[in-house]
């Protein structure tokens, strides 16, 4: 029953927040980013109230400050995509192109400047992917978030990292903030 209550309240809240922020698609990007932060806090609230989930952040003092960096995080659930927005200011997500096709949600992802890639496919479009990353890094101090294993995984899975995160680190020379997330248990 707790899982059902969580699902009802969580998804209803996400829909309400998404609808409330629809006009923000025509306003400055920072308003949509604020909506993402609210979704992160809503996610945390629902997890705590309905599922008694305690969110523990270890090593917060090690978060990179005052310079450009990217975040390489493990990806086990929807939780981290929302929650990371409460920790980092206006992150730019590197994500699979299919997410941009989701009505409303995809519009928000485009508005905040998310960088998309067609996974497992070499194409002309993907050749510009790295140029988009360079442009984003040069335009702002917003951190990039990449899930280097390329998809959500069960806590026990350990597939190899994709090449994107190492290429960003090696070729652009910006710092990497690794984050291990245990949201799948």
Placement of each model-derived feature along the sequence:
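A transmembrane-helix-recognition feature enriched in membrane-embedded lipid enzymes
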Residues: 1-56, 107-111
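Soluble catalytic domains of membrane acyltransferases
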Residues: 54-185
